[in-house]
Amino acid sequence: MDLTQIQNPSFLKDMSISELEGLSEDIRKFLIEELSQTGGHIAPNLGVVELTIALHKLFDSPQDKFLWDVGHQSYVHKILTGRAKEFGTLRQYQGLCGFPKRCESEHDVWETGHSSTSLSAAMGMALARDLKKTKEYVIPIIGDGALTGGMALEALNHIGHEKTDMIVILNDNEMSIAPNVGALHNVLGRLRTAGKYHWVKDELEYILKKIPAVGGKVAATAEKIKDSLKYLLVSGVFFEELGFTYLGPVDGHDYEKLFETLQYAKKTKGPVLVHVITKKGKGYKPAESDVIGTWHGTGPYKIESGDFVKPKEVAPAWSAVVSETVLKLARADERIVAITPAMPVGSKLEKFQKEFPNRMIDVGIAEQHATTMAAGMATQGMKPFLAIYSTFLQRAYDQVVHDICRQNLNVFIGIDRSGLVGADGETHQGVFDISFLRHLPNMVLMMPKDENEGQHLVYTAMQYEDGPIALRYARGNGLGVHMDEELKAIPIGTWETLKEGTQAAILTFGTTIPMAMEAAERLEKAGVSVKVVNARFIKPMDEAYLHDLLGKNIPILTIEEACLIGGFGTGVVEFASENGYHSALVERMGIPDRFIEHGSVTKLLEEIGLTTDAVVDRIHTMIPSKQKRA
């Protein structure tokens, strides 16, 4: 079937099961071929082909509402709703988004990117439906990994209490990104092995009611028997205790079983949870056999071999530099513990996990818990290293404020994927952390200019015992610089001069330092002398350096790959104003006041005007012509 000719899912209504099975094969082949060129979340989507087709066949989108939790498993949904022809642009600038996007299609009713939001949003939609007295189905699809998020559990509790009509699809593939952890995962494991409970209890009730005269009374009395049967067949039926009708487990790749179960769910009043078992990566051997999450989301790859197409790496990944330095220090200090909220692979903590399994803690998708747990460990003299993506640190903000900073606890936060991350787009760009951390009392915030300075700042963080300290580091690789053998502590709040200059100064840090250096060199050739400063401590700033620099009364340009509002540049302007300097001398470059879409980092920087050319042009406008050297 030519998938690019699909305009909407209505064609599924008349298809037989054998035809649907053929369509499943076509979709898997299409995904494997297309994603080999663009990259993307291949394994989650290969696992939900039949489930997505079944949902679109039995329900009527967009009248019926599908909410894809996290959203990375929505590719099949996009194909069935007329977007197959756009897959060549997947996750590229102004191309097809890798997550549901309301402006893309009326079938995308809820935008996602972070996990565990679908149930709360679905409850909102269901309550709105009931208030408006309409009849559509509301169907959140949530994975077993996302179900460990506290927000999802809060929503389950509320939905069950209110007895709201809703069909929750639990897509259980036993993995989120990496293998799942936690007690809830173990509950689901027991449910998988006790899948006959729902059908047995219904058959029992049906048979008892057929007994003449006394059947109804016996059936009523049998409720107690049925409850006992429930605990006999399923050890701890978590969802029914919350008020849901539990259906399953059902094979998520068997159309007959899916149709039977979903039709039953449509007829059932109140909240229903359909437990669907799927195989992540189904239909592509390398992805299907992956047990650690390598094929969850990938770049381009070779279909035949399963080898990833990567440029030759001349420098280590930032995540590896940080995690391996922490590991090196942990060998000499038993107090060091690594913590991750379900991202051991992305944060490059596999080596730490292998060497110190008892000191590497993966809490699952539970950022709030991870953060306060780290705080608790710090009260007992441990040295917790919390490795967390910038975008996911947002989910634990109150814990950083209330539990870490307020108590001034020695927690080292590794803020991975800081700055623009590219293809995952606006839900994942790490551009807000400076603004929401800079104003917190007791917080120290750093970002290195290269991987060598990065390892020294990790060492600095582990030696620091005066409160919380955070290190920002980017996605991707470092610069390939020489790495010192011996680690050293860098004095807190100190900057360094990278290039001397007399007519203007650039203050920057991290990934924008090469841009600043190149701009300064070009300006030098044009007769403009520009100082470049490595402002590696975003907080506290080097106040002595700033006093000296502002006292020279020369233009100052701050550059940051982070949002301008409340950012580093704002801090420099505030310092100038509060200390009697001419704050108009300071201009800022950074991320504007909007969400940044998906695309390559290079393209996005160009689009927002954060390039070497833009820096050169800005400096020229800041320096009066008469001050420029001939």
Swiss-Prot record:
Binding site for thiamine diphosphate: 72, 113-115, 145-146, 173, 284, 367
Keyword Magnesium: yes
Keyword terms of this UniProt record: Isoprene biosynthesis, Magnesium, Metal-binding, Thiamine biosynthesis, Thiamine pyrophosphate, Transferase
EC number(s) reported in the record: 2.2.1.7
Cofactor binding comment, as recorded: Binds 1 Mg(2+) ion per subunit. Binds 1 thiamine pyrophosphate per subunit.
Binding locations of Mg(2+): 144, 173
Pathway assigned in UniProt: Metabolic intermediate biosynthesis; 1-deoxy-D-xylulose 5-phosphate biosynthesis; 1-deoxy-D-xylulose 5-phosphate from D-glyceraldehyde 3-phosphate and pyruvate: step 1/1
Gene3D superfamilies: 3.40.50.920, 3.40.50.970
GO MF terms, alphabetically ordered: 1-deoxy-D-xylulose-5-phosphate synthase activity; magnesium ion binding; thiamine pyrophosphate binding
One CC-aspect GO term: cytosol
Keyword check for Magnesium: yes
Entry-linked SUPFAM superfamilies: Thiamin diphosphate-binding fold (THDP-binding), TK C-terminal domain-like
Domain of life of the source: Bacteria
Gene Ontology terms: biological process: 1-deoxy-D-xylulose 5-phosphate biosynthetic process; isopentenyl diphosphate biosynthetic process, methylerythritol 4-phosphate pathway; terpenoid biosynthetic process; thiamine biosynthetic process
InterPro entries reported for this sequence: Dxylulose-5-P_synthase, THDP-binding, Transketo_C/PFOR_II, Transketolase-like_Pyr-bd, Transketolase_BS, Transketolase_C, Transketolase_CS
Task of the protein: Catalyzes the acyloin condensation reaction between C atoms 2 and 3 of pyruvate and glyceraldehyde 3-phosphate to yield 1-deoxy-D-xylulose-5-phosphate (DXP).
Family, similarity comment: Belongs to the transketolase family. DXPS subfamily.
Subunit (UniProt): Homodimer.
Name under which the protein is recorded: 1-deoxy-D-xylulose-5-phosphate synthase
